Amino acid sequence: MYLMVLGLLVAVIFLGLEVKGSRSWFEFGPVRFQPAEVSKITTSLLLATVMSQQSFKIDRLKDLMLVALVIGIPMMVILAESETGSALVYAGFIFVLYREGFSGWWLFAIGMAILLFILTLVTSAYTAILVLIGVVFFINALNEGKLNWELGANIAAFLLLCFLPWIMEKAAGPESFLEKVKPLYVLIGIALVSIPFFVIKGYKSHNRFLSLSSLGVVAGIMLVFSTDFIFNNIMQDHQRKRIEVLLGLKEDPAGVGYNVNQSMIAIGSGGVTGKGFLNGTQTTFGFVPEQSTDFIFCTVGEEWGFVGCLVVILLYVFMIWRIIADSERSREAFTRIYGYCVASCIFMHLFINIGMTIGLMPVIGIPLPLLSYGGSSLWAFTVLIFIFIALYRREKKYY
């Protein structure tokens, strides 16, 4: 089943219908079908099958690579369809891995990479690297769990780096070579000279955490310097524009930012209790595009206000909590892992969709589970959830 759906994902790139720059739909007369939605079901089932094997160990490289292939292959194919929203949902499977024993430091590393990427775009490479070094200092201090002269020296060195641009500006005279030296290069030089010292120190003192965090600084610096290349050469033009508008680097209220602006106006105008069913001006008169699909949450906000939005969010939270609670009560590893896959998919859709409608996430086109119009999404989530219900009920019957 997994391979069959994977074949459909590849086929739709060549044979599918292009809708708003994304080639991810098959069209059969009046009916459209999106294989990316069904792929969440097959990926969840195969992931649960692989990870529920008695011989599986999450910290073994061979098993970890197998899991990465199960998740990564459909994710990459969906990205090739220019369906970024659906591909991003697969990143949520990392929560499943975390539940099964995957190190939480990987979650932290992913979050840190996103933060560095944003800081480099919004501020400067110097600020991003400075934040990286500061975070590593702080984490190592917590890991040591005690105050000593080395910690004090590290704090003093970090404060010196914070004021390095100001110090260099004041020290530079009209004929000084400091005028031609950029603080960023000085910071990188200090970091690259210091890192081997900390790696060796960690190795000699059997402090593996110190060595790995020092190497993490190197990886972070490489990411910072790769940001411009990734942003300008790998990302597509519409993706760059959406990120620039989201981060406030550019204003485009009549273009890329139109959907989000109208969505936030609709939600804000709803007030506490909303304008009433079908009484919303922004949605009724069509100011908000895709209001029945990707931006359906703004319809809820305008017609039912803050109270309606809160009720909808709480219903989703209750559903996710109930799936996780039932997964934890399960005696079979397959049911538990599959349940976490279902919860992760729903959470990612909820987080991205609502974040998109209120301007906290870029517009990437992703439906709100069981609420947005669209047969593929509705059927996929229905089957996804009911498979879990069937698995859980079968266990209750036999145990």
Model-derived features: where do they sit?
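Membrane-interacting alpha-helical segments
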Residues: S269, A333-Y340, Y392-K397
